[in-house]
Amino acid sequence: MSIISPQDVKKLREETNAGFGDCKKALSVAGGDFELAKKKLREMGIASAEKRLDRDAKEGRVFSYSNNIHAGLLLVSCETDFVALNHNFVNFGNSLIKELVESGRNSLATSQELELKNLAATIKENIQVKKIFITEIQSNEFVKIYLHGEQSKIGVLVKLKVDDFSKTEDKMLQDFAMDLALHVAALAPIYLRNDDVCPNYIKEQEEIFAKQLELSGKSESIVKGIVAGKIKKHLAEISLLEQGFVKNDKLTVREMLEEVSKAISSKIEIVEFKYLRIG
């Protein structure tokens, strides 16, 4: 039987980031063969990672990347905020979103799934890729991305279209695009415009509001008017274009788009947005 020295264990730990006990066990099973020990660690790690999948992973962070052809956001969860700051965790997320954006994929390849399992094995937490959002950037479009805070617990991507693409260099437009991303981070709209809201959802809300007014004693016509007003207010809360702009709530986002379009002499359109949040 080969003798496993503390120096051997230390070397394997430095190369794999695995725990002391796991490294010692892997070296023993591998008879001191470092490459075989690494393979054993991966096998052991994947097995233990599978066991951790039922543990809550309510922490994590959002990662982003853009290469002017595609852009994307990635939400990776973990169990503790300490791990969300771990350099291995952060490096994995940054590398993964870059690979996904550059390939235009919105799902993990087999090799990427294996990397995820190996990371979970090394860090010893339940780590999961929860959400992937990749969008293609068409001609006359550009994106603005905002990650909130040191731990990037909120990530926002806003894609805009400009009739005159040369205007994307305009500071007013760039500032407005960032303000839009900040707005989405702060108010978390669900839809871009009212027309995107499912008609069945609106009908359900109308029924709820009407039910609340059943005992009010008001006439049917007045109740209909009140319900219509409540629906309008509710849609303004969940539709980005109808929300009061975060930096000037006297104007809606739609009205701010028109103002900035006039100022730079080029029509601006919000094509889509994405909001991801940990927790």
UniProtKB/Swiss-Prot annotation:
Name under which the protein is recorded: Elongation factor Ts
Gene3D superfamilies, A to Z: 1.10.286.20, DNA helicase RuvA subunit, C-terminal domain, Elongation factor Ts, dimerisation domain
Keywords: Cytoplasm, Elongation factor, Protein biosynthesis
Gene Ontology MF, one: translation elongation factor activity
Main localization category: cytoplasm
NCBIfam families the record matches: tsf
Functional note: Associates with the EF-Tu.GDP complex and induces the exchange of GDP to GTP. It remains bound to the aminoacyl-tRNA.EF-Tu.GTP complex up to the GTP hydrolysis stage on the ribosome.
Chain coiled-coil ranges: none
Disulfide-linked positions: none
Cellular component terms per the entry's GO annotation: cytoplasm
Family according to the record: Belongs to the EF-Ts family.
Gene that this sequence comes from: tsf
InterPro entries named among the record's database cross-references: EF-Ts_dimer_sf, Transl_elong_EFTs/EF1B, Transl_elong_EFTs/EF1B_dimer, Transl_elong_Ts_CS, UBA-like_sf
Domain of life: Bacteria
UniProt region (Involved in Mg(2+) ion dislocation from EF-Tu), positions on chain: 80-83
Pfam families per record: EF_TS
Entry's localization field: Cytoplasm
